[in-house]
């Protein structure tokens, strides 16, 4: 199984940490790829940040489908 874990903010350090945590608990044979959008806020701390993160998040979800991930 291939899982694309999408951090909705653009902070790479957080994305890397999320990926490490997910890989630690993933079943054997599961590939976890952690990504963050190329556009959006560095953190999500309110409604405005949520709205600003949505376009980049949706772009990553669509890309995951095209890339053949089993789950995003």
Can you describe what each PLM-predicted range is?
Residues 1-58:
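N-terminal glycine-rich anion-binding loop in soluble enzyme alpha/beta folds
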Residues 54-72:
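Glycine/small-residue-rich loop that forms an oxyanion/phosphate-binding "nest" at active or ligand-binding sites
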């Amino acid at each position: 199984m291939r899982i694309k874990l999408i951090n909705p903010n653009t902070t790479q350090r957080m994305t890397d940490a999320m990926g490490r945590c997910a890989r630690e608990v993933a079943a054997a044979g599961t590939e976890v790829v952690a990504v963050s959008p190329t556009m959006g806020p560095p953190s999500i701390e309110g409604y405005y940040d949520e709205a600003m993160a949505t376009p980049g998040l949706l772009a990553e979800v669509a890309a995951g489908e095209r890339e053949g991930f089993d789950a995003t």
